[in-house]
Amino acid sequence: MKSLPIDAVLPALREALAGRHEAVLEAPPGAGKTTRVPLALLDEPWLAGQTILMLEPRRLAARAAAERLAAELGEGVGERVGYRIRLESKVGPRTRIEVVTEGILARRLQDDPALEGVGLVIFDEFHERSLDADLALALTLNGRALLRDEPLKVLLMSATLEGERLSRLLDDAPVVRSEGRMHPVEVRWGRASQPGEHLEPRVVQTVLQALADEPGSLLVFLPGQGEIRRVAEQLGEALAGRDDIRLCPLHGELDLAAQRAAIEPAPAGTRKVVLATNIAETSLTIDGVRVVVDAGLERVPRFDPSSGMTRLDTQRIARASAIQRAGRAGRLEPGVCYRLWSETQHDQLPAYGTAEILQADLTGLALQLARWGVEPGELAWLDLPPAAAYAQGRDLLQRLGALDGQGSLTRHGQAMAELPAHPRIAHLLL
């Protein structure tokens, strides 16, 4: 088995979890935490044959993580390692490690709040701070406190330097820190980007330059599907007749076959140019990539309480995301990252992104908390849900008939909460 940076701290992690029911693991991109940690803890005495649940922020990452873990054991998925994602499940009677998406756990908790038979919940990539991850952690901690007789351990794994803040949330849990990625990544800065500047020509020019100057496949980060489509069209024209270059889009709306084509090794004698959204920022190893081209932008949903509408905003990424993206180039060998902004602009970026819970529509969260029977203040959060957005979500639920005049869940609301859809859609479906 190939050595990874995370291996050096696995004894300390085992010791931390043997002595406490919570721990935080801080490890940069490429350290190997997703692949190594669940297997390292599988035979710990305190687990006593129970299951490990590991949460991933996206379906593609969950499936890929399960496949890598199973391969490490020399087995197929569905034996000791399985996964559950929306509309797809691959687990068996021998499964001890279940890799699930965050929304799957949040819904499982509603039916099984004590998580019977589970001995450890691992929140991988917790630094992404998705709404589902925050909700799942809050419900896990509350269900454990109220309903568990046997210990349930919780491990938060983060690639950013927020370990102390996460530790405070978990009653000053021990923080275990791993050193850097396996291979160095050279960062090459671009000129300062300008507001309103068309992104695609700069991306295409940089990709063509990288193909000429560097070996290996490329991973290109773009904000959305529209930019991916336009860059693919322009690169297709520029690379016409080049049978050695394969263009592969990668975003959440693609089917499984297209997603696999993007992350699997390029055929012999060819190189890939993977055009991806931030779906490729964490948890995925795209074989053969040693060059990253980062446009430095992302598209995020932002809720406006004054209008009750959610809009998609394109914004600059945080420095933590830029580090994550660059790390994709150093997974398997020394790499290069082209950033399409200047070093001066980089220094002005926020250190971390804004947690989804602070800028999202909270109607779905309000419905799940009503089903759980609590108010936000009764649970443990890294960031408390904003009062205005939460109140607006509750108001919409009452207008949809999900809550009665006293704010209690109705039978219609119970049925809505069981559907994996926004409450507006669930109401229409019922």
Map each language-model feature to its residues.
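P-loop NTPase motor module signature
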Residues: 1-428
